[in-house]
């Protein structure tokens, strides 16, 4: 049974009803009545109402961020306010209290931090563990589309003309970076990035929230950004661009960026011209501080330990990357924020403020100061290439793998091959513009359909023929990786470079009995990717049908949204075919699967989540996580197999 005294369908309906028109009046009669009559101090809480009393005191004393104003999580004060609301929701003891608070604060607090707190608590609260929210690009479309779309939507509303709007990427053909705008500006990719930071928030404090988020530093700070970086480089190679160059604090920011995007309230996102020198940002950080924090982290990597309370923390092991990830961000898990700083978070603020570093023009935050918009700016990938290279120094300092550590005795991959051609193409993706316009009772609503161009691929599958020579069945973990075969100079990547640039394609578990087996794995089943979330209207229709009949929603596949959009599994191909290397590794799952029954169900969060342990005890990227002294160590084990494929684009 769903906890809290309400069905999952009712919970989903209530929360969704507060989302799509967050800037206007609540339309559901029951929730509207709650917004007027509910008293947060009368609710049932597991913290005796401490959080509610604190937030209500701030609200009544008019100390909270005003409505109709931009909100940025990176701003310490607005983040503090947002977490006050999160705490009230998190400590709600039943659904009546949760729904009452949601309706009440929906009309009393800043719209931006209401949305952030709501999405955060739905992900982390036990009361809402099966609630599915609409995609953020429907709820806060101004953060996901350009101003041209916004203007056309308003024109359609005012003229009462249902319309289709075709969105364009920013920039022009004279800007080479425009060739890969389909990656950084994709609304699914933007949603993927912000969702990771919702699932693994840097502000999470175990002492306040009653549980530890396992491997947060490794999963979010290191691995997901590493995968974004290597995938971006693969897309660049497909478009005849050099791999992205890392950022340097003592160098200029080479690429400018004009977002052509506006806040709902607060003006346009600031532009940044080409070749801007870094400046100190008042009230945020000095450039020399960023260099100092980097030097201290580099020093820790070189020594293999961090200093903490007069002792040391060893990082020359599998857990070290998790510690370093927390230090980089830095999260509340960082051993010494005062000494190692917050390189990642401060870098986002420093980069985002370069258009107005001293506040002379009172400009709002730049795109890099919002997780929703950050990947739109090419500087995002320069920043994360810079951080990725520091992580690489750590990983390359680890003891190389030996053959005995990699082999799986008695298991052989006899052959692997792709079934059919690997083909990519561009298609139009439609989403509703329901939340772009002000919805009022004075002017009728009109249908606004927004279309964007997405990269997609046809279904692909790999077949692995595997033999288990042992007498008993064994649990096996199958890992599929890929990387570009040649670099931008048409030189074949060395194995060590390819190892670092691998794109994770899939990871799954199978139980193999004695004998020969053929494993046919479709891209549709990949645990790395997820489908697009259902739209607000789709969720509304499903809940409206389920609630009166006491039915279940059955939308479990959308509960975890940490994966990549499923259309981005493989990088863009070429008309003549893009050469890619594919490696399949079959390794032992016995004693290394952290969750029971993985071979019987794919319904697990691939990268883990706060209430579920990460399913694989191995480090992200295993068995290519650490270096090897000789490529023949990899090619010489029978449980690894490598082939070359071509990816075509039509």
Swiss-Prot record:
It is found in: Secreted, Extracellular space. This is Hemocyanin subunit. Its main location: secreted. Belongs to the tyrosinase family. Hemocyanin subfamily. It comes from the Eukaryota. Contains one N-glycosylated and three O-glycosylated residues. The position of one of the O-glycosylated residues has not been determined. O-linked glycan at Ser-120 may be composed of two GalNAc, three Gal, and two N-acetylneuraminic acid units for a total 1525-Da MW. Hexamer of a number of different chains. Keywords: Copper, Glycoprotein, Metal-binding, Oxygen transport, Secreted, Transport. The keyword Calcium does not apply. It comes from Scylla serrata.
């Amino acid at each position: 049974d769903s906890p809290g005294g309400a069905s999952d369908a009712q919970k989903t309906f209530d929360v969704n009803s507060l989302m799509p028109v967050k800037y206007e009046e609540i339309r559901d009669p029951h929730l509207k009545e709650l917004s007027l009559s509910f008293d947060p101090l009368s609710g049932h809480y597991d913290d005796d109402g401490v959080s509610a009393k604190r937030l209500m005191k701030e609200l009544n004393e008019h100390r909270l961020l005003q409505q109709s104003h931009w909100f940025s999580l990176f701003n310490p004060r607005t983040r503090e306010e947002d977490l006050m609301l999160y705490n009230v929701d998190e400590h709600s003891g039943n659904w009546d209290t949760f729904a009452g608070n949601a309706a009440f604060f929906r009309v009393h607090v800043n719209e931006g931090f209401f949305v952030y707190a709501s999405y955060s608590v739905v992900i982390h609260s036990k009361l809402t563990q099966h609630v599915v929210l609409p995609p953020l690009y429907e709820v806060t479309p101004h953060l996901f589309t350009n101003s041209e779309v916004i203007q056309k939507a308003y024109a359609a509303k005012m003229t009462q003309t249902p319309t289709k709007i075709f969105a364009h990427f920013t920039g022009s053909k004279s800007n080479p970076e425009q060739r890969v705008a389909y990656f950084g500006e994709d609304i699914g990719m933007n949603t993927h990035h912000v969702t990771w930071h919702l699932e693994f928030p840097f502000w999470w404090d175990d002492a306040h929230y009653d549980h530890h988020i396992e491997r947060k530093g490794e999963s979010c700070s290191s691995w997901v950004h590493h995968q974004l970086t290597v995938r971006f480089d693969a897309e660049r190679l497909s478009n005849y661009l050099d791999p992205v160059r890392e950022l340097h604090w003592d160098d200029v920011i080479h690429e400018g960026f004009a977002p052509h995007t506006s806040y709902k309230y607060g003006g346009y996102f600031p532009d940044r011209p080409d070749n801007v020198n870094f400046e100190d940002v008042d009230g945020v950080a000095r450039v020399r501080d960023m260099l100092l924090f980097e030097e201290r982290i580099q020093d820790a990597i070189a020594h293999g330990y961090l200093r903490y309370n007069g002792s040391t923390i060893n990082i020359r092991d599998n857990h070290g990357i998790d510690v370093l990830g927390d230090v980089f961000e830095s999260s509340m898990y960082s051993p010494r924020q005062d000494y190692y700083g917050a390189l990642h978070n401060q870098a986002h603020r420093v980069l985002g403020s370069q258009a107005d570093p001293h506040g002379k023009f009172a400009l709002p935050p730049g795109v890099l100061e919002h997780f929703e918009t950050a990947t739109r700016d090419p500087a995002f990938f320069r920043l994360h290439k810079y951080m990725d290279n520091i992580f690489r120094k750590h990983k390359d300092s680890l003891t190389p793998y030996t053959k005995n550590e990699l082999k799986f005795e008695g298991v052989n991959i006899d052959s692997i091959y792709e079934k059919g051609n690997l083909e990519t193409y561009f298609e139009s993706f439609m989403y509703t513009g329901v939340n772009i316009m002000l919805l009022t009772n004075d002017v009728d609503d009109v249908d606004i359909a927004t279309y964007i161009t997405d990269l997609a691929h046809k279904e692909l599958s790999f077949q692995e023929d595997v033999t288990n020579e042992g007498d008993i069945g064994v649990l096996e973990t199958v890992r599929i990786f890929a990387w570009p075969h040649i670099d931008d100079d048409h030189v074949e990547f060395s194995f060590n470079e390819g190892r670092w640039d691998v794109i994770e394609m899939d990871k799954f578990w199978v139980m193999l009995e004695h004998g020969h087996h053929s494993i046919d794995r479709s891209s549709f089943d990949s645990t790395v990717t997820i489908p697009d979330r259902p739209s607000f209207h789709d969720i509304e229709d499903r809940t409206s049908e389920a609630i009166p009949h006491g039915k279940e929603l059955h939308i479990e596949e959308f509960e975890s949204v940490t994966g990549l959009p499923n259309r981005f599994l493989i990088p863009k191909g070429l008309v003549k075919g893009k050469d890619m290397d594919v490696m399949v590794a079959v390794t032992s799952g016995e004693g290394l699967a952290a969750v029971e029954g993985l071979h019987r169900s794919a319904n697990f969060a691939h990268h883990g989540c706060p209430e579920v342990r990460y399913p694989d005890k191995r480090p992200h990227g295993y068995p290519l996580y650490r270096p090897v002294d000789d490529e023949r160590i990899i090619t010489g084990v029978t449980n690894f197999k490598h082939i070359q494929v071509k990816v075509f684009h039509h």
